[in-house]
Amino acid sequence: MDYNVKDFGALGDGVSDDTAAIQAAIDAAYAAGGGTVYLPAGEYRVSGGEEPSDGCLTIKSNVYIVGAGMGETVIKLVDGWDQDVTGIVRSAYGEETSNFGMSDLTLDGNRDNTSGKVDGWFNGYIPGEDGADRDVTLERVEIREMSGYGFDPHEQTINLTIRDSVAHDNGLDGFVADFQIGGVFENNVSYNNDRHGFNIVTSTNDFVLSNNVAYGNGGAGLVIQRGSYDVAHPYGILIDGGAYYDNGLEGVQIKMAHDVTLQNAEIYGNGLYGVRVYGAEDVQILDNYIHDNSQSGSYAEILLQSYDDTAGVSGNFYTTTGTWIEGNTIVGSANSTYGIQERADGTDYSSLYANSVSNVQSGSVRLYGTNSVVSDLPGTGQQATLEGTTGNDTLTGSEAHETLLGLDGNDRLNGGAGNDILDGGAGRDNLTGGAGADLFRVSARTDSYRTDSASFNDLITDFDPAQDRIDLSALGFTGLGDGYNGTLAVVLNSAGTRTYLKSYEADAEGRRFEIALDGNFAGLLDDGNLIFERPVIEGDAGNNALLGTSAAETLLGHAGNDTLDGAGGDDILVGGAGRDTLTGGAGADLFRFDALSDSQRNYTTGDNQGDRIVDFSVGEDKLDVSALGFTGLGDGYNGTLAVVVNSAGDRTYVKSYETDADGYRFEFSLEGNYQDLGSESFVFATPSGQQLLEGSAGNDSLQGTAADEIVHGGAGRDTLSGGAGADVFRFSELTDSYRTASTSFADLITDFDLADDRIDLSGLGFSGLGDGYDGTLAVVVNSTGTRTYLKSYEANAAGERFEIALDGDLSAFTGANLILDERVVLEGSDGNDTLDGGSAAEELLGGAGNDSLDGGAGNDILDGGAGRDTLSGGSGSDIFRYDDALDSFRNYGTGVTGTDTITDFTPGEDLIDLSALGYTGLGDGYNGTLAVVLNGDGTRTYLKDRESDAEGNQFEIALDGDLVDRLDAGDFIFAEAAATTAIEVVGGTPTEEQLVA
């Protein structure tokens, strides 16, 4: 039955207060057992009750409020209302309400003409009590201009649906789902809200978000999070389709939640990350288009990081694990660092498969997790690893996709259901894949072998040639054949019950590779189910077009102007002679040059045969020039290569300025601007003088050559000879060479040359030569003049004191023969200094005065000293060090400020060293902690001590940019480890707020 509010006295004239009339219609419908309350087109003014929880209008079971359409029927809060309203329309507080809803109208909070916190729609049962609202439906509802939340279904609700609705210009979130069970948000739009577009929070589970759109919101587009109570985390959330763009923070943030799937969405143009997974488990990110995020600074398109709540309401540290990222297209903006990045904070077991990543600045993928994997192929789904021991283990998988590692011993591995990877390791192993497409991996020839008299081969019990595979790529076999010349023979036993893959070529111990498969597989094994070494795609002397596949391949162009495209896989591309165009495609590709003439240019004749690399990805791809003798980057002379960007900034040349007899010099180009291209992107030849002779833990005898070598004996009593050349003898631990009161374990250097050789002690903390005390080393020659000792007389707790023996009388040994600290020191004065570092690792000491320090490239240490200093680390992992609390301070009483500004601090890479000042962690700025505070316009972050010294000075540092959500204890060197506590944001909008009725 329909109940028209005008029959109950409502006017809808935009002036009169229609609250009582509309409520009377609702009550009448409820009293009749249910019905539809109809509001014709018009503006209906309403007011709140005595308590915020009274709301304006209370909807009841079996009642639906229906208007004439969004924007046609408007329910608007009266002008001048100055109290909180927890729902202009809401279900009754403390009552279970069911089968109710609203459609085809607009709720207007009249934000500009009211005060107090006003929410639009609110429903839900008492938090923490038994009971729930049920079967709630909202369709085609617009909620606007609320000072609080738009849609706020809050606390226990079962089976809520909100579809085809809009929330905009609200003071907090557009849509909230707080402790919703089995609900749906479908085809909704949330825009221009002050905080998040959608906020799914507080134990919500089994919830679907389908084809929703969030844009232009001040916070994130969509957040899945626990909230600020210590309650069960959200789980079982499906985000399918939709778009999340142009939001101030992340496009999508998944925080303290588990079993969340994000798929088929477009996420772009957001201020921070496209997607951030933050202290969450078992998140799947599938088949999304994520692009052009990081609009407010340098961020990854997808970030995986753990969440430290040890100082929060739970006291727990939530590690991000089990993230599955597959089939996404990721295109960076000019600011995007990585396509996908893990933080080095315990985040692990991430699985990345078949993602396309392009146009990022630092690299496609950055993983720190020991068990995290990345591949260009579709994933088999390994989200757990079962690992054995050196003994005889039995490992049994589940229905999930797992990796089973037997290690040593005679192991029994059973993958169960799922697409599993089984690697028995050493020993005679029994391998059963179970259901699913399984991969049996052999990592060494001695993992499965036989001799002339005994068998130590593994047995695969259930190989399915239609879907299973055997990975032999690590063993160097080239394919099937007669078992000779690097091939494997397929041999069936006489009973036809067992098939062997075997080599007839034995190693020095008489071992030849062999693996057994239960069953008759004669004629069924081929390249489709056996993975051998990298295939080669080869051209000829003509102009070839070579196209790879999704597998890892080697493409050889040879002569001619070739076009090589690796497509997927970790490929090797060798253009050969001619002017070649090289595209690696997806994967970590290697572009290799085997001769100087492979890519060359003659500036006299104008002949350009330089190769062009179309899609080089820093941090993932490599440039191999090791065969050409180049030893590093530099000015293009003396065996170095110069990096030069053209005037348009769209092409980078890597070139030598040294020509051959015909006037040609080596040169190739990269499409794009790679002005910061570093040596880590290259495979260089070993520089002269840098060959490393490395010993073991035993008593080694290392003999150098005529080259310049680094000789490192390691532990044990070693005999070291550098040979001719300028050699460096390196000692990295005190126990590499030492003696006790009774016994010598000192290394002996037999041919130390005072003119050319040096001893590297830079890792041991010695300050120089002296009397052997106070961190110095004494030079002592024995009585016969046949041996010289470099020794310390200060012993450690075990009675060990450093000592080296050198053959001969080397009493002329000086500090110039020692390497104690290679870092160059640039030191200012008491005035206002400008110190500019170079490409090396340097220490910049400003001293007194208002100094400007710029580290340039290299891993630098910057210490501004007293005064109001400006510190820029430049590229590299830099340390900003403070030795005195008055090096950077503010006095709020006198108005005097001596606050340093760090212009380019990069969390996760740079460090701030406060260990000398006694601070123990981040916190509220009291009791030895520092508060993290954002200024009002969000452009500068402060580290503040709230406690003053006797003169009223408070230690304070300024960091350019909004780093509030990015700083944690790992970015600092404190006096002692301490848990990170909550951080304060001044003038900014937090990403999380306790939702309170």
Swiss-Prot record:
EC numbers for this chain: 5.1.3.37
SUPFAM superfamilies, per this entry? Answer: beta-Roll (SSF51120), Pectin lyase-like (SSF51126)
The catalysed reaction is: [(1->4)-beta-D-mannuronosyl](n) = [alginate](n)
Mapped Hemolysin-type calcium-binding repeat ranges: 388-403, 406-422, 424-439, 557-573, 574-590, 695-709, 712-729, 828-839, 846-862, 864-880
Cofactors required: Ca(2+)
UniProt keyword list:
Alginate biosynthesis, Calcium, Isomerase, Repeat, Secreted
Q: What is known of its domains?
A: Composed of one catalytically active A module and four R modules.
Which PANTHER family did the record assign?
Answer: S-LAYER PROTEIN
This protein's name = Mannuronan C5-epimerase AlgE5
Species for this entry: Azotobacter vinelandii
